[in-house]
């Protein structure tokens, strides 16, 4: 097994761990999920370029009679990247004490203000950061609003 194969195995393991965390573990952390909203995907073209580059590496490895293990690992990496970018939806998870956005937990008490832009982007101002949240369906903005109104304290 070459160093390349070891590096590919490490990256595949890290991406699988991230996918499992994002899909299953995050839902169980910090209490019950009270509202889940799907967000718009970002940078689809970046993943297409990444998968295309991996396809070129697979082609080069096959044409140069490279190790079959390397080819399988490259294909596995491409499949995981495809899943993370095109099949899995980014999501906003509302819990009792805060919400998960971009895999980070943000407590409600950190919210300084909330605004809605003209093009349907929810802007949440935190202490030192501004979140720009683009929901997949505009009806979800009303669900978020109702959630905050019902759970004010």
UniProtKB/Swiss-Prot annotation:
Top-level taxon of the source organism: Bacteria
Recorded topology in the membrane: Multi-pass membrane protein
GO annotation, cellular component aspect: plasma membrane
UniProt keyword Methyltransferase, yes or no: no
Transmembrane segments: 6-26, 45-65, 67-87
Swiss-Prot/TrEMBL keywords: Cell inner membrane, Cell membrane, Membrane, Transmembrane, Transmembrane helix
Pfam families: DUF986
InterPro entries in the cross-refs: DUF986
Compartments where found: Cell inner membrane
Keyword Ribonucleoprotein in annotation: no
Similarity field: Belongs to the UPF0266 family.
Protein name: UPF0266 membrane protein YE1773
Source species: Yersinia enterocolitica serotype O:8 / biotype 1B (strain NCTC 13174 / 8081)
